[in-house]
Amino acid sequence: IGLSYDTYTGKQISSQRAMRLTAVFSCVRVLAESVGMLPCNLYHLNGSLKQRATGERLHKLISTHPNGYMTPQEFWELVVTCLCLRGNFYAYKVKAFGEVAELLPVDPGCVVPKLNSSWEPV
């Protein structure tokens, strides 16, 4: 599943195959776990002061409850793992009553980003 890349030897390597290498697995794991354990908060500017936006729904999503089956640490570890191995991370925004209720991870291999002539997402 997913993309594979040709190496200078002519062999193809995918992210799954790369993760079988101890060095790759260890590097990705250290990065993912290090970022995953950090607190993630949403801030807003109040004049020149930054204040934590604890009343915002998005704050709860990114800091305490991204979805019904993942802790914030698991979610951010997956984000970093996808960024390391695929270069992108995508999440489906589940909306309820006009607000984002959950962020569901999507396999980057199943998404084709579309960009306009200015390289901005469409």
Regions found by a protein language model. Name each.
Residues 1-120:
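Flexible, gly/proline-biased loop segments at the beginnings
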